[in-house]
Amino acid sequence: MHIHYNTNQTTLPLEISSFLPQDHLVFTIEKVVNTLEDSHFHAFYHAFGRPSYHPKMLVSTLLFAYSQGIFSGRKIEKMMVENLAMQYLTGQLVVSYRTINRFRVAEGMEELIRNLFIDLNLRLKMEELVTLDCLFIDGTKIEANANKYSFVWKKATEKFSAKLQEQIQVYFQEEITPLIHQAIELDTQEPISSEQLLAFAQVLEEELEKLNQDIEETPVKGKDERKTQRRKLKKVLRKVKDDFSVRAEKYESYQETFEGRNSFSKTDTDATFMRMKEDHMKNGQLKAAYNLQIATENQFVLHYDVFSNPTDTKTLLPFLETYPHDLKTVVADAGYGSEENLLRLDEKEVNHLIKYAMFDKEQKRGYKQSARNLGNWHYDNKEDSYTHPDGWCYRFHHIKHQKTQTDFQQEIKVYYADEPESAPQKGLYMNERYQNLKAKECQALLSPKGRQIFAQRKIDVEPVFGQIKACLGYKRCNLRGKRQVRIDMGLVLMANNLLKYNKRTNQN
């Protein structure tokens, strides 16, 4: 005896929502997206052409697809045909994958996702799921949608560009100048640009045209030296126009693309080659990637941004500048604890708990008793000198100023040993401002409240990366270009937020 079923019979009810459980994710997505103000969608309205799909419907379908770990436009279109929950969101419309992909990178999409995050943050605060008082910040590297062997290195570019300049100088002096009447003077101090080379090519073409005209007007029987000169001019013209100028233009475009970086990918020029944690070959191979920075509370991503530089130190200040709410407390690991970051946060009167590079080592008993610890040295305030536990004296000599890669000015006091030959180190370099900032930070981190808040960081921000990589399968970007990657990552993080929001609201 089996349960009766018939696939050819019409069934009731016909509303798709009645086939879905009441706590299904699509109802939460629909509620969150539909409550957005219509003004946020004005960029998607057009006064011409056939009626377009509603942007709220398209955003909802993208968020649901991303929440299921599906990122391909063709697979999203397939979901609209086969998936009942997706059919509920689309009203049983089937949107072409081309439309989906075009909408995903549309002009107003980045601003729309930003507004979606702001709206969800306020909703979470109203429902007391977050307070917006404390930001837990961390970063991860996501592999770019680029060929792993499409790298361009800054040092190699500078090396080959310098070689090209040498070749041009020699070639112009030996081959070009003797051939033409108009003398060409090259600046040996400044590099020759591709525009200058094209101008030289124009001069050569004019010279060649004059020579051709001269040969036609006054032909010579037998051997003609002018024809030999014409062959040489044609050869030189090809060299300048098709070789030197092309290579010079390529190196110039490379230098413009670097934008302070040491590498980029030809496939996705905004991506930088970074050392990834997933190193299956165990050879430290670099891959084109982006640095994703997120700020969370209660495992909800409140803010995110994408950077092309691999280190977290230089990302903190620009990341916080784009945060849409009031900054109160920032919690981050040792990758963010630079002098500039700590100083700027103090100037903005933002509370912060940020480890610095030596914090964990300073708490160990061996370091506290070590002679390397400056706390164990005797400091003479009058003479401005430090005395090593074994008796060597280091006296103040001068102040050294240096700039970081972000043009931040550091002031370092230099001390030299009285007996440099026998002393364990000849000099001592002291950044007093940074030492004071670190001492203040150490006191805050070791306080009972500081310990409690900082311990929360590991279970707040780091699980989010595991969820989007392991649960949603987002380990590689689906789009190319920094702007498009920012949209792509925003959809993934928002989908992860909505999964959590749906689960927690239905539990309550």
Where are these regions (language model features)?
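Hydrophobic alpha-helical membrane-insertion signals
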Residues: 1-27
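Anion-binding and metal-coordination hotspots
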Residues: 2-4, 62, 70-82, 93-508
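Short hydrophobic "helix-edge" motifs at membrane interfaces and signal-peptide entry regions
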Residues: 13-14, 44, 85-87, 128-129, ...
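Generic, well-ordered alpha-helical segments
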Residues: 21, 49-57, 68, 72, ...
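Basic, short loop/linker segments at the boundary and entry of helix-turn-helix/winged-helix-like folds
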Residues: 22-63
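Short helix-loop boundary/capping segments at the starts of domains
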Residues: 34-42, 66-71, 82-89
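Catalytic micro-motifs at enzyme active sites that drive phosphoryl/nucleotidyl and oxygen chemistry
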Residues: 48, 86-91, 122
